[in-house]
Design a protein with these regions (language model features):
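Core segments of transmembrane alpha-helices
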Residues: 54-67, 128-136
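Mid-bilayer segments of alpha-helical transmembrane spans in multi-pass integral membrane proteins
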Residues: 88-94
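Membrane-helix exit/interface motif
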Residues: 25-29, 58-72, 94
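Functional transmembrane-helix hotspots
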Residues: 94-103
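Interfacial loop at the N-terminal end of multi-pass membrane proteins
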Residues: 2-60, 103-119
Length: 144
């Protein structure tokens, strides 16, 4: 049972990390190369859709990582589970203020504020990318 739980934890974390890496290194830089109005118009639906996929993956990866640790998988699984799980409170506490400003319908899409908010969002997303990637590496080296 532990191996299958570990495999599922690793799978959820890998999907999260892979998507986060893609956004950090491909999608968001491309978005920033557009005019702010277009970048914002692309960010909004992308963010909403990404949230529907990424939040459950982080929660599943964290839960199954903790189950793997609890089932005798070792301290590495606890650390990995906590790392991927920390993406959710990080997003809620640290990133949501920026997200909310970007989602604000009264935000002038042509303003310099949009570009600065998108740059800030990219930096915050890079933290999620790093947390999930480190969690995945720990899971891999833990033998999942």
């Amino acid at each position: 049972m532990t191996l299958s739980v570990q495999s599922l934890a690793m799978s959820a974390t890998a999907i999260f990390a892979g998507a986060a890496i893609y956004v950090s290194f491909v999608e968001h830089p491309a978005r920033l190369s557009c005019y702010p109005t277009m970048a914002l118009a692309q960010w909004r639906p992308s963010y909403r859709r990404g949230t529907l996929m990424q939040a459950p993956l982080a929660i599943i990866g964290a839960f199954l990582g903790l189950v793997s640790w609890w089932s005798g998988g070792g301290l590495a699984w606890l650390i990995a589970g906590l790392l991927i799980g920390s993406v959710v409170p990080f997003t809620v506490i640290v990133a949501f203020p920026t997200n909310r400003r970007l989602e604000d319908a009264t935000l002038d899409g042509a303003s310099d504020t949009v570009r600065q908010l998108l740059i800030t969002w990219g930096r915050l997303h890079a933290v999620r990318t790093a947390l999930s990637s480190v969690a995945l590496l720990i899971m891999i080296f833990a033998g999942g």
